[in-house]
Amino acid sequence: MSKTRYYLEQCIPEMDDLVEKGLFTKNEVSLIMKKRTDFEHRLNSRGSSINDYIKYINYESNVNKLRAKRCKRILQVKKTNSLSDWSIQQRIGFIYQRGTNKFPQDLKFWAMYLNYMKARGNQTSYKKIHNIYNQLLKLHPTNVDIWISCAKYEYEVHANFKSCRNIFQNGLRFNPDVPKLWYEYVKFELNFITKLINRRKVMGLINEREQELDMQNEQKNNQAPDEEKSHLQVPSTGDSMKDKLNELPEADISVLGNAETNPALRGDIALTIFDVCMKTLGKHYINKHKGYYAISDSKMNIELNKETLNYLFSESLRYIKLFDEFLDLERDYLINHVLQFWKNDMYDLSLRKDLPELYLKTVMIDITLNIRYMPVEKLDIDQLQLSVKKYFAYISKLDSASVKSLKNEYRSYLQDNYLKKMNAEDDPRYKILDLIISKL
């Protein structure tokens, strides 16, 4: 009862303000207070549920909408610069806070809380949202969606790429075996570099000093007033995790210059993360499927290693599809890095000898890489011939079954992507391509 009375007493100045401004009558205010009393009793009872908090929030939201409408209609203004302008919104935030304290495991309610605070824009402090994320991450450090949400908030709202990178790396210390978090980290790095390159093109930023000043100004413009004092306090992983993932790039790595002078601007940061990702996911996959004790049966060990490579290969194909989306980057350079990765023997296995189906997939990607992004209108015959040369170089080293499989796939690729889209009568390239396909 004491809590209920205390919370209701906090409403009195707000109710007086609403009556004084002529926005609500005394009778309406009494009904609002009665409704709030009912909600407070429910919230403070032992049998309260998360739905009670949601209903209370919905009710307060409706009261605030009605207040805003009357403010515009009666007073002819959007704001009255008085207590009732912000008190209801503040109460809604407080109800959310109380709900998360009582039901800390309800992630949907946490998401509603965050969305509400973010939707308020400048009315919500950067520090407040940080505090919510801090609470969430301490309670749910193994939920990667929270880490991703937090990282995106830093970058997309505040253009704080250093903080975003730190959040991803801290998240990976807790969740090194989760592919989704690695994928989103790589995606962030590619988005960051793309945005940086395009911005510099538009603004004509050539020398490094201009680029550095622009980055500082952009971050300053997006910085909230209380951002400097607020830091994300991520939970500790303990001493055993301190040296793990130490191959990841530093948060303040230089991105000045151009792609010719700075490999970071070609996507090398993302590629470094890809390499660490493959190594880490592979290790955790093996540990998960065999435990931490060695398998004595060598045949079982080989099968597990093959299974691991299949798993990693499927993940690497997702990255190739991701690279396809970044039109402003050297996509063939990024994909070639993945192909080079698979040329190395791993877990005492070779793709070519032990997993020929996977090997043929890398071959197919390699021989079509230089024409991968050429639409039929821009197909260059010289580049096509280079692709064909690669094809013949590969089949000279393959067995007959593999040659047949690669031949069929390469032929279908050329027909579906180019030949069928050409005009046989008007396009001189048609006969050349048709002849090439017939000689494969």
Swiss-Prot record:
Note: Present with 7520 molecules/cell in log phase SD medium.
Gene behind this protein: UTP6
Biological source species: Saccharomyces cerevisiae (strain ATCC 204508 / S288c)
One GO MF term attached to the UniProt entry: snoRNA binding
Region entry Disordered, spans: 216-241
Parts forming coiled coils: none
Keyword rRNA processing included in the entry's annotation: yes
One GO cellular component term: 90S preribosome
Subunit (UniProt): Component of the ribosomal small subunit (SSU) processome, or 90S pre-ribosomal particle, composed of the 35S pre-rRNA precursor, the U3 snoRNA, and at least 40 protein subunits. Component of the PWP2/UTP-B subcomplex composed of DIP2, PWP2, UTP6, UTP13, UTP18 and UTP21. Interacts with U3 snoRNA. Interacts with MPP10.
Top-rank lineage group of the source organism: Eukaryota
Pfam hit, one: U3_assoc_6
Start and stop residues of the HAT repeats: 87-119, 124-156, 159-191
Keyword terms, alphabetized: Nucleus, Repeat, Ribonucleoprotein, Ribosome biogenesis, rRNA processing
PANTHER family the record matches: HEPATOCELLULAR CARCINOMA-ASSOCIATED ANTIGEN 66 (PTHR23271), U3 SMALL NUCLEOLAR RNA-ASSOCIATED PROTEIN 6 HOMOLOG (PTHR23271:SF1)
Protein name: U3 small nucleolar RNA-associated protein 6
InterPro entries: HAT, TPR-like_helical_dom_sf, Utp6, UTP6_N
Localization annotation: Nucleus, Nucleolus
GO biological processes: endonucleolytic cleavage in 5'-ETS of tricistronic rRNA transcript (SSU-rRNA, 5.8S rRNA, LSU-rRNA); endonucleolytic cleavage in ITS1 to separate SSU-rRNA from 5.8S rRNA and LSU-rRNA from tricistronic rRNA transcript (SSU-rRNA, 5.8S rRNA, LSU-rRNA); endonucleolytic cleavage to generate mature 5'-end of SSU-rRNA from (SSU-rRNA, 5.8S rRNA, LSU-rRNA); maturation of SSU-rRNA; maturation of SSU-rRNA from tricistronic rRNA transcript (SSU-rRNA, 5.8S rRNA, LSU-rRNA)
General function of this protein: Component of the SSU processome, a pre-ribosomal particle required for the maturation of the 18S rRNA from the 35S pre-rRNA precursor.
Protein family per UniProt: Belongs to the UTP6 family.
